[in-house]
Amino acid sequence: MAKEAARVRRRERKNIASGVAHVNSSFNNTTITITDAQGNTIAWSSAGTMGFKGSRKSTPYAAQVAAEDVSKKAQEHGMRTLEVEVAGPGSGRESALRALQAAGFTVTSIRDVTTIPHNGCRPRKRRRV
């Protein structure tokens, strides 16, 4: 009886025409989350979940593959238009944005929402290579 209740529910297909793509590109990874207008997550992907490990996660190609994966998931829900919010200093920002546009989404706006400290925490030490 309890085993029947523990079964995983299938995600129901929502019909959402427009949403917001949050592209977070750090120095180590790129995550892309597509939400509806209220902020409820519809689909997400990252370079790490696409099988890239280590320093390959931070490449523009890994961000492009993650964007193609998340766009496929979002189009199953009927999404066609996106607002894009880009955050972070990483190298996968532009390639993820280009991959979302190439997947067939009409991008209505692009915003940079990277947080900038007003002299907050002390930064990391300089790398000497």
Curated annotation (Swiss-Prot):
Coiled coil: none annotated. Gene3D superfamilies: Ribosomal protein S11. One of its GO terms (molecular function) is rRNA binding. GO terms for biological process: translation. Part of the 30S ribosomal subunit. Interacts with proteins S7 and S18. Binds to IF-3. HAMAP family: Ribosomal_uS11. This is Small ribosomal subunit protein uS11. It comes from Bradyrhizobium sp. (strain ORS 278).
